[in-house]
């Protein structure tokens, strides 16, 4: 991973996308700072990873907003995308197993990470939700599992960027850019944002 010239907790910018990487097994959950809805959702999960992810998310956003974690004003769009009410930056998050990722920028954005695991039914999955060109790339690839996860994380990130589910049609008038992420070898990830005259830089931060 390249050297990072940007400090963690820098003021969000449209020139940067800050990516906070979290080992959920190394952090603690604090149910007291979660919303009622978050606590109810946490109770439905067998592991505490959801609660830890929301705890860390609120702690980071609170530090950027100069608010206590429980005071962070998180709202949910009709499509399910979280946003900060009345604030000038956006965030998106994803977690898989013990790994979490929180993306922050002044740009609208979507992020997805997945654990890399061989998928025997990858083509069947792809044909349900992916465009024909993505399916063709998977079929033609020597390492089709690798390409499947590239295409899947791109699909998720792009749809999350505009607050849509993966079965929803994307508006062709909305031009999106994306980048594959530099992550541990067992992970694949992607972040997407609306097309910009200047491509934003990615800054990686480890949460310890």
Question: What does each of the following model-derived ranges do?
Answer:
Residues 1-208:
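Core catalytic alpha/beta fold that binds nucleotide/phospho-ligands
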């Amino acid at each position: 991973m390249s050297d990072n010239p940007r400090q963690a907790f820098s003021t969000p910018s449209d020139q940067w996308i800050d990516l906070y990487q979290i080992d959920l097994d190394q952090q603690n959950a604090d149910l007291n700072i979660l919303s009622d809805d978050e606590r109810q959702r946490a109770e439905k999960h067998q592991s505490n990873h959801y609660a830890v992810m929301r705890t860390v998310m609120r702690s980071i956003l609170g530090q950027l907003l100069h608010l206590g974690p429980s005071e962070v004003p998180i709202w949910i769009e009709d499509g399910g995308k979280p946003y900060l009410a009345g604030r000038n930056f956006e965030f998106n998050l994803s977690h898989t197993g013990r790994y979490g990722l929180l993306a922050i920028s002044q740009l609208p954005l979507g992020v997805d990470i997945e654990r890399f695991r061989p998928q025997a039914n990858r083509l069947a999955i792809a044909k349900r939700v992916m465009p024909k060109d993505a399916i063709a790339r998977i079929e033609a690839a020597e390492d089709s599992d690798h390409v499947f996860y590239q295409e899947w994380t791109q699909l998720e990130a792009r749809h999350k960027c505009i607050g849509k589910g993966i079965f929803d049609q994307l508006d062709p008038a909305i031009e999106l850019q994306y980048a594959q992420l530099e992550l541990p070898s067992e992970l694949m990830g992607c972040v997407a944002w609306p097309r910009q005259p200047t491509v934003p830089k990615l800054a990686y931060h480890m949460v310890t």
